[in-house]
Amino acid sequence: MDLRVRLIQDYYEGESIQALAGIYGVARKTIYKWLERHDAEGVAGLADRSRVPRHCPGKVSDEVVAHIVAARHRWHWGPRKLRVKLAAAHPSIAWPAESTIGEVLKRAGLTHRRKPRVRTPPYGQPFAAVDGANQTWCADFKGWFRTGDGTRCDPLTITDAHSRYLLRCHLTPKCDGTHVAAVFDACFREHGLPLVIHTDNGTPFASRAPGGLSRVSMEWVKLGIVAERSRPASPQDNGRHERMHSTLKQSTLKPPERNPRRQQDAFDRFQHEYNHERPHESLGDATPSACYRPSPRPMPRQVPELEYADDCEVRRVSQQGSVKMRGARTFVSEIFAYEWLGLRPLDERYFEVLYGPVRLGFLDAREHTFHRALHLALRRRLGLEEA
């Protein structure tokens, strides 16, 4: 039943019926059946129902089942190879089809279903227009490399999308949220706050949590910054930044410096040259420094708490990642532990779950379940825009 719940959630998150059929190994007709049961009965509708036929002339005999199970224990093969082996060893027995042998192995607990890959939720909003400085910053890690002494280096780079100004080119000791947040905080204090930060879907910028948020991007949301993400496997969405990486590599990494300190010195020299000396054709042969101005939005001394509209019920997330609603707890995600979420009622049963302006999903107050998305027919009934 857990797989069916996950299938339903994946469908609501945008997976097509055909893709789900391949991922979960079920027929499209079966998926439509589960969607109908879920709409009518909620999660309870996904439970197994009796499928015992009144008459089963093709039932596999206990003797055949015993042979199949014994063969599986001896050879860890799939149904096709097992059938060939069994037919050669016992030619007098009418062996069932490969699919039936597969079902016998499945019922005996001798198969392992491949788990579907959990992906970062897609960013469903159009990319922000860029026609001025600090409207969008782009950030990414330049691919790691080793300096002459064998030390691994992971340079974090941040640019202003409009002016191409290289705000940071910094070697971080680790690619985790703590070190990355420290680099961004220093950048915010020097240059002010952008309206949008565009990254890929990797850690620590994004995660598989609802809304695709991570600890780093959650702080951005509190600062009033939109955390914008590229489409999966689409580096062209951050093309300006990738072209800067190509120039950075040609200028500073062929070959790398002797040690990280010297490598950072090389990055600092490149940053100055890139910003103040190198003309950019896209800027009319001006330099980035001639086109960049600090943001009028200063970094506050303390990161503010999120605020919600009056029509939202505000709930604090427990350490275990759940919120209390109508006397029962519903799990959302542990990443939001101790954070305040807004629950905007859509009708008597469904609530939109918000982290500031970011939609995380929907809470079913009757079933006490959280869904990252809702079925199209239900969204239309609730008057929701396409998400």
Language-model features: locations:
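Short, basic alpha-helical/linker "hinge" immediately adjacent to a nucleic-acid-recognition surface
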Residues: 1, 9, 17-73
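Mobile genetic element proteins and their domesticated derivatives, centered on retroelements
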Residues: 7, 20-21, 31-34, 42, ...
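Basic, flexible linker segments flanking DNA-binding modules
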Residues: 43-138, 144, 214-217, 287-299
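Acidic/histidine-rich, metal-coordinating catalytic segments
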Residues: 175, 188-209, 231-233, 238, ...
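Charged alpha-helix within mobile-element recombinases
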Residues: 209, 215-300, 342, 346-347
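C-terminal, beta-rich DNA-binding module of retroviral/retroelements integrases
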Residues: 271, 275-387
